[in-house]
Swiss-Prot record:
Its EC number is 4.2.1.96. The keyword Lyase applies. Belongs to the pterin-4-alpha-carbinolamine dehydratase family. It is an enzyme of class 4 (lyase). InterPro entries: PCD_sf, Pterin_deHydtase. Keywords: Lyase. This is Putative pterin-4-alpha-carbinolamine dehydratase. GO terms for biological process: tetrahydrobiopterin biosynthetic process. One of its GO terms (molecular function) is 4-alpha-hydroxytetrahydrobiopterin dehydratase activity. Pfam families: Pterin_4a (PF01329). SUPFAM superfamilies: PCD-like. It catalyses: (4aS,6R)-4a-hydroxy-L-erythro-5,6,7,8-tetrahydrobiopterin = (6R)-L-erythro-6,7-dihydrobiopterin + H2O.
Amino acid sequence: MMPTLNDEQRKALFAELPGWSLQNDRDAIHKRFTFTDFNAAFGFMTRVALKAEQVNHHPEWFNVWNRVDITLSTHDANGLTHRDADLARFIEQAAQLTGAK
């Protein structure tokens, strides 16, 4: 099983990725992204989906019009791992490229 992130790694992750927060009910991180419209939100989700397939690590997400809520956790490890950190970094880049507010 993959090890979960330790306290130091978590602090570094949150410092690097502003706006992400730890969920209260489980060992997962969450962020809400807002875009100009549905097309921009869907374009963002498409970029993330392609990367998720490539690395075989998939987000939990919810989309309503221009808003996308994303939660990351590694189910096999029952918590946050480097896979979540890596995908969160990619998600941040994709959000910038697609005009997240």
